[in-house]
Amino acid sequence: MRINPTTSGSEVSAVEKKNLGRIVKIIGPVLDVAFPPGKMPNIYNALVVQGRDNEQTNVTCEVQQLLGNNRVRAVAMSDTDGLMRGMEVIDTRAPISVPVGGSTLGRIFNVLGQPVDNLGPVDTNTTSPIHRSAPAFIQLDTKLSIFETGIKVVDLLAPYRRGGKIGLFGGAGVGKTVLIMELINNIAKAHGGVSVFGGVGERTREGNDLYLEMKESGVINEENIAESKVALVYGQMNEPPGARMRVGLTALTMAEYFRDVNEQDVLLFIDNIFRFVQAGSEVSALLGRMPSAVGYQPTLSTEMGSLQERITSTKEGSITSIQAVYVPADDLTDPAPATTFAHLDATTVLSRGLAAKGIYPAVDPLDSTSTMLQPRIVGEEHYETAQRVKQTLQRYKELQDIIAILGLDELSEEDRLTVARARKIERFLSQPFFVAEVFTGSPGKYVGLAETIRGFQLILSGELDGLPEQAFYLVGNIDEATAKAMNLKT
């Protein structure tokens, strides 16, 4: 940990100024800087541009290439407007470092760890460099364990791995944001953990909406900011590619501190992992590298691996990552999503069809997958229940065309029973969320895994065939469904 020369103007003057360079070339967000012989900065060092007459320009760059002839090529983390050849550049002799620890909760940061929420400076002197190695193999926690979310459809059919990586697929307006906020809320309540949200190359409006919704739902506590459950790091669409490429590492660095020092379970959200690859592709072209397949950077797998391998469980704590994945032109073979899939342990697919039916969370039970759903990991009882739920829903899906044309009466007795149970299961997969209480008026429910399994076993066994299907809609555990059925009858 070190005092951070990249996060505030006043500290730059404290940086030892012996290693000064000068800008010799500017091409968009890329600068070439000449240094005195024998004083070349290291790769990934942060450089701070000094304005004329010591006027602070606040442009921080990161060294990407050593060109020879005492020159380096650096990528700017902010706009290069107003920079000129001949300006002095300070080598900070360290990578970009960002504030870490409890004082980051409830705040919004940019890629350099500077707060951008107009709430004043961050109350910490503890900073950490954004570039570091993945934990050594001996530090890893290799035990496979389920990360219980309290959300029935996720825990039963596509369970998350503690310290794993989950891909979140869904279009606009199907409930990605609400699902993310519920997960942030549940990890804080059930696991005593915290969350870090990395907004990578997405719309500024969406980042602002998320912040306002988090304040409204209590995930960010305005009265007592220290009781907030999440830190936000944004590098939005309008930022230079350097910032969008590094903002994921800034968020990850904050999450690593909570895992390694505070020994907590951490949820790391990255929205959107595709934009991280896209920014790397832009930077790669600016640095003059030969493009690879479909115009992507030749270092695509390495860059993705260096980010993903740091997201893991250690003996101290865990980082479980949920990454929104944009699939360009719905082509799953595109190198960007294809490289991401190699790292994922589970996929959560949100369905517009379910959202249209009013079933929230609109997680598709048949399309969502998890490598954790194996009998040796989750146990025989969980595995069997999940498989029977999927088989029932799959059969219902196959029968829907027949029902639409001929009606329910033309089905066999067995198929009619399957349809009735499938409709109950479909409704029982819905759940009231804590963060949606403000909008729905229904109190949120956290359902433990054992309760979830028991509920679906009772539906599958036929014990609840006599209950109306609306009794299963937007309830927590199965006891609430039976109580609701009694109320409907009276």
From Swiss-Prot:
Compartment(s) where it occurs, according to its Swiss-Prot or TrEMBL record: Plastid, Chloroplast thylakoid membrane
Catalytic activity: ATP + H2O + 4 H(+)(in) = ADP + phosphate + 5 H(+)(out)
Pfam families the record matches: ATP-synt_ab (PF00006), ATP-synt_ab_N (PF02874), ATP-synt_VA_C (PF22919)
SMART domains from the UniProt entry: AAA
Predominant place of localization: plastid
InterPro entries: AAA+_ATPase, ATP-synt_VA_C, ATP_synth_F1_bsu, ATPase_a/bsu_AS, ATPase_alpha/beta_chains, ATPase_F1/V1/A1_a/bsu_N, ATPase_F1/V1/A1_a/bsu_N_sf, ATPase_F1/V1/A1_a/bsu_nucl-bd
EC numbers, comma separated: 7.1.2.2
A Gene Ontology BP annotation from the UniProt entry: proton motive force-driven mitochondrial ATP synthesis
GO MF annotation list: ATP binding; ATP hydrolysis activity; proton-transporting ATP synthase activity, rotational mechanism
GO CC entries: chloroplast thylakoid membrane; mitochondrion; proton-transporting ATP synthase complex
Membrane topology per record: Peripheral membrane protein
Binding-site positions, ATP: 170-177
tRNA-binding as UniProt keyword: no
EC class (word): translocase
CDD domains reported in the protein's UniProt record: ATP-synt_F1_beta_C, ATP-synt_F1_beta_N, F1-ATPase_beta_CD
UniProt KW keywords: ATP synthesis, ATP-binding, CF(1), Chloroplast, Hydrogen ion transport, Ion transport, Membrane, Nucleotide-binding, Plastid, Thylakoid, Translocase, Transport
Spans through the membrane: none
PANTHER family: ATP SYNTHASE (PTHR15184), ATP SYNTHASE SUBUNIT BETA, MITOCHONDRIAL (PTHR15184:SF71)
General function of this protein: Produces ATP from ADP in the presence of a proton gradient across the membrane. The catalytic sites are hosted primarily by the beta subunits.
Oligomer and partners: F-type ATPases have 2 components, CF(1) - the catalytic core - and CF(0) - the membrane proton channel. CF(1) has five subunits: alpha(3), beta(3), gamma(1), delta(1), epsilon(1). CF(0) has four main subunits: a(1), b(1), b'(1) and c(9-12).
Family in the record: Belongs to the ATPase alpha/beta chains family.
Protein name: ATP synthase subunit beta, chloroplastic
Biological source species: Ipomoea obscura
UniProt lineage: Eukaryota, Viridiplantae, Streptophyta, Embryophyta, Tracheophyta
